[in-house]
Structure formats: C-alpha cells, structure tokens
Amino acid sequence: MTDFRRIRPIKQMLTAQQIIDLLRLIPHESEGGYFRETYRAATVIPATALPDGYSADRNASTAIYYLLTPETFSAIHRVRSDEVFHFYAGDAVEMLQLSPDGTARTIFVGNDLAAGHEPQVVVPAGVWQGCRLIPGGRWALMGCTVAPGFDFADFELGKRDALLARYSTHSELIAALTPNS
C-alpha cells in the first residue's frame, strides 16, 4: 500500500544547479549541457553482429540524464546508433534533425501536448541533431536511451561550414547549435 505521507506536492521549481547537484550531473564536454550515465546494459553485442561501421562490440543499450540550461546547448552531432529522447521536466527544447537525404525538421521536445510538444523523440542512427532550450526557458531535464549502446567512437561533432552548405534553409539554427570554429 502506498504511504501518501511520504508523497508531497512540489512547492517550488528546482533550479538547474539543484538538479545538477541532486542527480550528480557533470558537464558534457564534447556536446554541451550536463549529463550522467544511469544505465549500461550488461548484454554485449559482438561487432560481427552489428551493422557495418561499428569498430568493436557494443553494450545492447545505454541511458543518460541530460540537462540543458540557458547557457548551454547540445551541439549538432550524430551517432551511429538510434537515440530516443525522453522529456522529464522543465521548459521545452527546440531540436533540429538533419537527415542524410537532405531533409530537415524542427521538433519541440516538451510536455505541452496542446502546443505540439513531443515528450518522446527518436533520432535515427546517422541523423545530425542538436537542441537548445526555448527562449526564456530556465532548464530542461531529459533522458536519452541509445541502442546499440553509446560509445564515443560512434560520436561525430558537426562542422558548421559543411552543415550550412548542405542544409542552408536552416542556417540560423545551425549557426546557433554549432561551436564557433
């Protein structure tokens, strides 16, 4: 039976720093934002059973917490595996996905379904993606599940000039989501 004396309504919104501290998040040096890996499957998929391009065995799946603040963004990148983003709390996030076929789409990841937000978003393997907090937002807490599991060997950071040449109709968002280099 549930002990409702232990369940309290939220009295005030946490700050980003409180979330970082409570969830023991660390800066995501290569991408931006803050994260902590929370799960790495014990099951390992041999490289011989994986699609072309994987250099070694991979865990079946991995999961992280991921936090964005007004000072951070997720730099445009791609990974070799499918990613599934889950929205947990906070303000919505604007995500840009750039597909290998040249198409692009912007998705709002959040919990305001009436406004068209999506609480769960799939980023297919090989699709460039980056995201930022909506203007005026304080923070967004999400999760990201990757299968086959994430490995930095499968991570590629996007180069602004190459992305602008290929996806010129999204130049403003590409410029905002790529490091100044």
Model-found features: residue ranges?
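N-terminal amphipathic/basic-hydrophobic helices that include classical n-h-c signal peptides
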Residues: 1-11
